[in-house]
């Protein structure tokens, strides 16, 4: 009797562990490759319409995926080798211009202006990813990942790999955390309470409390797993990348994993008119996955 009870409990626990995956993905849906003609895709960002912009970083290009037609068109071939991107409230595409050590803002004609060039009069290492809070605050990671396609000075520019804050309308970065080992993907909660940061070399995800002045407190390890880019859904689930896409609930429990048949899955965001299409950048390709949950 005891053995049967233990077996029943084990089966129930397994079912419960698997159930959340079925609760976030639309029935019968699996990742679908929509294009595969790139060198290395990165930085997906969704605009107000639901279209997704993404980079082909080695080829210095940004592309736009039309959420209605599925068509992909070139947005610009002068991207500053942009990595992570995010749309601001005014509809500008904010991009981490990795090769130029800068943060850029693109209008919808593909013209850019420079938002940030340095910290304390020294160039940044190479901005990697950015998240914008609802109040217009920017949070930016600046690790040092030397690229073989850089044509600029490839030396490390900053003594640390920093996590930075940029106040709304400001142009001077504020250091938030100088102790990180290759900070990478970054995303915050829509209520502005928490910030998640991937620490690549430490192979973990950190969570901070965001204060009213934009500063961070109460740093904690959220998950013992690294990530490249990240995103969040309307239930507070966090989507990590690298070996496919792995999903953690807001309590830090792993609830799903979506294998992607590529060497590396670099980044992810929610697109589509209803923000229910998970858009995945993975090596030379991009994929979509229809979800039950929605992006923010």
Region annotations inferred by a language model:
Residues 16-296:
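Sequence-structural signature of mature extracellular/luminal beta-sheet repeat domains
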């Amino acid at each position: 009797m005891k053995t049967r009870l233990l077996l029943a409990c084990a089966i129930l626990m397994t079912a419960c562990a698997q159930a959340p995956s079925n609760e976030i993905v639309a029935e019968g849906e699996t990742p679908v490759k929509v294009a595969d003609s790139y060198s290395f895709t990165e930085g997906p960002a969704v605009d107000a319409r639901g279209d997704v912009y993404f980079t082909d970083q080695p080829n210095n290009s940004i592309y736009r995926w039309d959420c209605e037609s599925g068509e992909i068109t070139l947005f610009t071939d002068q991207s500053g080798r942009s990595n992570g991107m995010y749309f601001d409230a005014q509809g500008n595409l904010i991009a981490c211009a990795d090769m130029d050590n800068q943060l850029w803002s693109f209008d919808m004609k593909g013209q850019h202006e420079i938002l940030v060039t340095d910290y304390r009069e020294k160039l940044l290492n190479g901005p990697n990813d950015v998240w914008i809070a609802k109040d217009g605050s920017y949070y930016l990671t600046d690790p040092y990942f030397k690229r073989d396609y850089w044509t600029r000075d490839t030396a490390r520019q900053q003594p640390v790999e920093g996590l930075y804050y940029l106040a709304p309308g400001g142009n001077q970065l504020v250091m938030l955390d100088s102790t990180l080992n290759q900070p990478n993907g970054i995303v915050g909660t829509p209520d502005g309470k928490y910030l998640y940061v991937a620490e690549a070399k430490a192979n973990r995800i950190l969570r901070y409390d965001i204060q009213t002045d934009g500063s961070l407190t109460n740093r904690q390890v959220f998950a013992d797993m690294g990530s490249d880019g990240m995103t969040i859904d309307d239930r507070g689930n966090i989507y990590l990348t690298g070996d496919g896409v792995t999903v953690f609930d807001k309590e830090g429990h792993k609830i799903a994993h979506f294998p992607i048949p590529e060497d590396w899955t670099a980044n992810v965001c929610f697109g589509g008119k209803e923000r229910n299409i998970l858009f995945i950048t993975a090596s030379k390709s991009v994929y979509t996955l229809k979800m039950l949950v929605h992006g923010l």
